[in-house]
Amino acid sequence: MKKFTAVLTVIALAVSMPGASAATKIKVSPQFKVSKKNPVVTFKVSGLPKDHGIYISQCMDPGRKPGGVKVCNPSEASKLWVSNVEADQAMGAKAGTGKLTLKVDKYFEGGDCIHTTCVFLVTNDHSAADDRSEDQVIKFKFGGINLF
């Protein structure tokens, strides 16, 4: 009977455990009609990790795996470091509570966000680089008519 109770307890705990998903929630505006003339997007971030931050980068779409990203925009203007840790903010991280903006490029070295799909790749920062729990891929598109 003790073994049965122990097994039942383990099963109950396993069923009640939340699935693996990023705790940080990110909203992008605009997401699917980014201006070609003024390509700036705004992020609203909630649920940041308490002991480290996240990176947000403009990249080519990796397909189904976040680890599959091959080409990201090398421009510092197309990257964000977001953290609510004071020491990180002292080193240049943006607070997750304010207005977060990012300039994105239509084209960058090895990247074409007009004719292919681009994404914002979200990962844990250097303080938790091996932890993949915050990995997210958020697709975005430039708006308007392509005259090519």
Kindly label every feature range from the protein language model.
Residues 1-22:
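Secretory targeting and sorting signals
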Residues 23-148:
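Extended, solvent-exposed regions of the mature portions of secreted/cell-surface glycoproteins
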